[in-house]
Amino acid sequence: MKAIRKVQKEKTEWQNIQIISFGIAGADEVFLEKIVELGGWDLLDGIALHPGRGNFTPDFPVIAPWEDFKKPAFGYQYWNYYGSIRVVKNFIQKHGGDKDLYLTEIYALDYPNHSWNDTPREAAENLLLSYALAAAEGVKNALYYQLFNSVWFDHLGVNATNREYFFGMINRDLSFKPSLMAFCNTAEVLDKAVFKGWIRMDEKHPLSRGILFD
C-alpha cells in the first residue's frame, strides 16, 4: 500500500482514489490492532467488515443502543451483526475516527431446517433491520450477499445439503423470496433517509426501542 500511495501523488486525480481494507470477517480486534502495529492503518481510507450473523436478530447483543457498547463477557461475543458494527466503530474512533466503515457482506440466508439460519420470513425481517441499523450507524456502504442462490464456482447450481447455496434473494427457479421484496422496500424507504435518533419506549418496556429517520 505504501507503493500505491506513492504513485497516487503523481497525479491529482489519483489522489481521490479511496483504499479500503479487505473484508474482515467479524469484529476481529486483534487483527485490527495488528494492522495498526504494522503501519497499515494510516494508509487506509476505510475499513471493510463482514459482520456475519448467527441465529439471532441483527440487533443482538446491543440492548441499549443509545449507550456505549461493550462486548459481552460471555455467550456469542463475536459472530453477531450489530455488536460487530459497534465494536469496529469504537475501534475506528479510538484510532483517530477518520475511517469510513463499509459492510461488504450483509446476509440473511434461509437454508432450510437449520437452527443457525433464518426462515424465509425471518430473512425478510432481518434484512430490513440490518439495513436500518447500518443507516443509523452512518455506514458508508452496505453490500448484500447475494442476489441469486448458488455459489460462484457453480453458477445456478443446486445443492440441498450445502448452506452456501442459500444466500440469495432469488431462488434457482427464478422465483422471488420474501427477502427480495424486503430489499426493494428497504432501498426505497431508506433512500436519502437521515437518522434522527432512537425512540425509547415507556418504563414498563425498557428493552423496546425504535429507530427514527427523516
Identify the role of each PLM range.
Residues 131-214:
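Aromatic- and carboxylate-lined catalytic core of secreted/periplasmic carbohydrate-active enzymes
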Residues 1-130, 137:
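Noncatalytic carbohydrate-binding groove/subsite architecture in carbohydrate-active enzymes
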